[in-house]
Amino acid sequence: MTEESSTVSEICARGRENLKKIGVDGLFPRIAPTVKANRQYLDSLFYETRLFNPVDVDTSLNLFNLKLRTPVFCSAISRLPYMSETGMADIAKGMADAGSLIMLGIVNSADFQAVIDTGAPVVRIVKPFRKTERIYDELREAESQGCVAVGMDIDHFHGVLMGGERVRATGQFGPQSTEELKQIISQTKLPFIVKGVLSARDAEQALALGASAIVVSNHASGSFNFSVPSMMALPKIVQSVGDKLNVLIDTGFENGEDVFKGLAFGAKAVGFGSSIVLALAADGSRGVELLINQITAQLARIMAATGCADLPAIDKSVIAEIPFMRQ
């Protein structure tokens, strides 16, 4: 089977095998209860086919003043220990070649510059550092380097959860008051994203503070074990603020059918993280591009089968919930 015809699961499997060869085994071994519940909920959602009167499908969208070919983006990602020196840039190139963007988490200046040099659309997500001057420094750097948007992980206000048990980085990260966050948002000309929103209340607060977008996210289970699963939190959030800012989502999405369900529930775009890391390990930037292309192809097929010509046409009217599938 050629690389071009590889499925999403085959790309990820090849990535795992390549990581094993360098001594990295059992990548992403633990799945938090909130992510398991999110998976069960996604698997309980089915779509209604509408096969007569076929439509030509367009998966493109406008986001952060960009025309993207796909609503599938790379969630905020940081350099992992086993990545090569070009790993971050390779992900960025793969995302750009697939017609999408990359969000960056913690990166050093060299990695950041390498990503920028690929020409990929870049979103810089900063951490809620207790030393707020570092926040401003990173925002200024993002602006000067041509990022298309910036943002902050509010779900790290109280540190990072490692392996579901160990809390770390509480000395480095800390909660930002609403006044502090409002000031931070006001200091950048770029669209500001609040990442880690899991309630309508926080979504409304983000809007009031001047955010242009939010990411409904549990940080790949790196924040809380039992927070509301992102897909279950999404409808109330969309109902509350969906017509006023861009609502994005991530955490536990695996394929184009998952993306379709996220869009049907009101998200404008869907982020992937773990799968992209595996695709990078499989075939470098080409693996990332192949992964995003395959996910987008899956999405396009379901759109065609449900009579949805473009992304705005996807809504909950094509979704049927089958609760017994969650048992």
Please report, for each region that a protein language model flagged, where it lies by residue.
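An N-cap/entry alpha-helix motif that binds or orients negatively charged groups
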Residues: 2-68, 313-314, 320-327
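Short, charged beta->alpha transition segments
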Residues: 55-65, 103-115, 138
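Active-site cofactor/substrate anionic-group-binding motifs, chiefly glycine-
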Residues: 63-107
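Short FAD-binding loop at a beta-strand-to-alpha-helix junction that anchors the flavin cofactor
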Residues: 69-75, 249-251, 269-271
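Alpha/beta enzyme core
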Residues: 92-93, 97, 118, 130-249, ...
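A gly/proline- and charged-residue-enriched helix-loop-helix capping module
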Residues: 96-133
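Short beta-alpha connecting loops at secondary-structure transitions
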Residues: 277-288
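N-terminal pre-core extensions flanking Radical SAM catalytic domains
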Residues: 294-312
